[in-house]
């Protein structure tokens, strides 16, 4: 693909040049080619976007629920019509295999938008009788202008996960995509405008987190920030949001999630789940089950089943429909993952497979890392304690149920957890003791629109998807009505 034209900001229904004068490049990680130069939003651009959003939000909130629902459903239709085009762009920007982006990223994002479009008419208040002459009624009103700050691993899906409930509740959103993968969020803005969204209701400001992101979190005109990213960045977002105007926040942060295989589990099923929990999207999924706990007596058999499945991984041309494994999203991220792999070797973990970059024709110019499995891991190892966000699985053994529960919970994270067992009594008993917000029994990874997702502990605050997320983009107004004559004590 030839280099794209310079990408601008999207404010008030159209593209506009940034006033900051700063630009950055977005790179195809499969081959190192520059895809485009992108303009970065500065403080004046954030001010412009907020003013635009304030204007658009008033128009949007004044529409009827059915009018808003129809516009968002029209956007869903356009997303599905343009699925292949958007998936190709997502593959170029992220490096993910087209077999994945064409069936997951836009598809699931559109599902979430459709879900919230259908919920808009159901967003209602309540009536509370006090006595014969008085009652209270409540209204759910939009917050106003909110900000979404996305991560680089699921660019358009995250933009939809954040914008769908916000817009459904009558808000306007200013969205900052990751500077690593900014392209499809701009296309989403085009689609919203084409669907009939009023100008300003969805503005997109590319730029770095330390500049554009900070300006958004500090801006007094923004009522809420929804952030997806790392824990350290999330803490800064929370601090800025609180210091500026006590903004509400939703935080979807990191994870180091446990996948527990019990001794009664079908080991073929468990190995299939472990593969998906570690190597889907080349391991760049926040919910990955990277700490795989296996009964000591099953270790050797499980290792062989994992090795057999690693042989089925097909890395290569990301547009080949048979390819199911792509490069990492960027060269700096590749180097960081390689540092973790080196640390694992240094601390005594045994490399079962992988452990290096992929080499050879088609790989040398890209950010490729081989699918890596470490065994003989211990809980104190760096690769077991810290989020790597790459194709690195750690196998650990255990002896008892109580032991594995304790060790699974021994982490600052609490995003996800999984169990593989034939005993559903055990599954529920153990799951109720695991400290994680997104949990799976005999499966892994699905996050449907109806399912609230979010973490415990350092993995986040608040939830995305589900009814409660729609409500989190509203504020409740309570109104008392008195029909009898008011009696003053004065």
From Swiss-Prot:
Its cofactor is K(+). NAD(+) binds at residues 150-152, 176-179, 230-233, 254, 286, 387. The modification Cysteine sulfenic acid (-SOH) is found at residue 286. GO terms for biological process: glycine betaine biosynthetic process from choline. InterPro entries: Ald_DH/histidinol_DH, Ald_DH_C, Ald_DH_CS_CYS, Ald_DH_CS_GLU, Ald_DH_N, Aldehyde_DH_dom, BADH. K(+) 1 binds at residues 26-27, 93, 180. The active site is at 162 (charge relay system), 252 (proton acceptor), 286 (nucleophile), 464 (charge relay system). It catalyses: betaine aldehyde + NAD(+) + H2O = glycine betaine + NADH + 2 H(+). Pathway: Amine and polyamine biosynthesis; betaine biosynthesis via choline pathway; betaine from betaine aldehyde: step 1/1. It comes from the Bacteria. Keywords: Metal-binding, NAD, NADP, Oxidation, Oxidoreductase, Potassium. Binds 2 potassium ions per subunit. It holds the Pfam family Aldedh. K(+) 2 binds at residues 246, 457, 460. The record marks 248 as: Seems to be a necessary countercharge to the potassium cations. GO terms for molecular function: betaine-aldehyde dehydrogenase (NAD+) activity; metal ion binding. Belongs to the aldehyde dehydrogenase family. Involved in the biosynthesis of the osmoprotectant glycine betaine. Catalyzes the irreversible oxidation of betaine aldehyde to the corresponding acid. NCBIfam families: BADH, PRK13252.1. Dimer of dimers. This is Betaine aldehyde dehydrogenase. It comes from Shigella flexneri serotype 5b (strain 8401). The lineage of its organism: Bacteria, Pseudomonadati, Pseudomonadota, Gammaproteobacteria, Enterobacterales. The gene is betB.
